[in-house]
Amino acid sequence: SLTYFLTKPYSYPNHVWVDVTMHNLSLPPLAIKNPECLGLLHQLDRNKDVWMQHYCILKDGCLYFYSSIRSTSALGGIYLQGYTVTEQSLNSRRCIIELRPPSEEFKAFYLSAGNAAENKRWITALKMSINKWLPLHQAIQDFMSRPLEETRM
């Protein structure tokens, strides 16, 4: 079985969002409130060259993987900050969603929904979820780079 580990992203080491996403890992998929996208995705296991089906939930820049809709907790997830989302043609039969990481130290993920329309739905949702967090990331960076006397309340 495939397991994914969420590690605290270096850019948000003590942010409440990290605690929320870590908590969400322990929840069943339908207990996550207001997901941005949900449904079945196949993920390419490049070690075995096979596609594994997962029930997935996208919420606040994090993609959670479950073995099924009836799972009691997530297998794991991916923090999507910094990832780019593109559609690639694998062969004549299948278009895939490529999640490319911000640097070589992280791995790329290859996903596929049931059909082209589902792929487009996921791509749109993934891009929106990632972009929603870019202003927050920039605001945190700007705040952290200010002189100490300006950041006191």
Q: Language model features by range: what are they?
A:
Residues 32-78, 122:
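Polybasic phosphoinositide-binding surfaces of eukaryotic membrane-targeting domains
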Residues 48-53, 85-142:
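Canonical pleckstrin homology
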Residues 63, 79-89:
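Phosphoinositide-dependent membrane-docking surfaces
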Residues 64, 86, 145-153:
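Short amphipathic alpha-helical patches
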